[in-house]
């Protein structure tokens, strides 16, 4: 087993073996974000679902009110006058057959892919390349749309797509260590409400198994989910 650095050992010593109140957990994670860069703050949610069943799958979007603190490179597959609309709205890449071809060759210098419905038959052929990376456009996620300007604006402002993995775990970044504790709490609360609102119809028993938050280089801290759910929306 690899030996832990003194920094990590010291940070781990600050985290008690217990469940923390939401704001307390956020403050501790911020305190432990001691790397020389602005660490990303992430939430890891274990849900009581089995995604191999279609009625227990979770895939949706969340619009974080305080944003993510990260720039998002957006590519758009469309054609005609929509190409100009995409570029004007702020897409880093916009193309039709040429972009489809370059993606097929593995050239993917973007974080999010949006497509207009008329291009989806061609985009669908890229499933083998896009699927494993979670980049395949999907109507439920708002990444298949004719309103490109609105979609690009929303994703640039902090809208995120997320899904439960095969183990029923959701991984979502919800801010930066430089954010205030209140801003991070507002984002985390919004994420919790989104997960509850989109509970799969086939979910049985206890829905929330656990919620941990962590920074890029710091230890994870368990959050009291019930306490988070009890926070008023205007907190």
Swiss-Prot record:
Gene3D superfamilies: 3.30.190.20, 3.40.50.790. SUPFAM superfamilies: Ribosomal protein L1 (SSF56808). One of its GO terms (biological process) is translation. GO terms for molecular function: rRNA binding; structural constituent of ribosome; tRNA binding. It comes from the Bacteria. Keywords: Repressor, Ribonucleoprotein, Ribosomal protein, RNA-binding, rRNA-binding, Translation regulation, tRNA-binding. One of its GO terms (cellular component) is large ribosomal subunit. Part of the 50S ribosomal subunit. Belongs to the universal ribosomal protein uL1 family. Binds directly to 23S rRNA. The L1 stalk is quite mobile in the ribosome, and is involved in E site tRNA release. This is Large ribosomal subunit protein uL1.
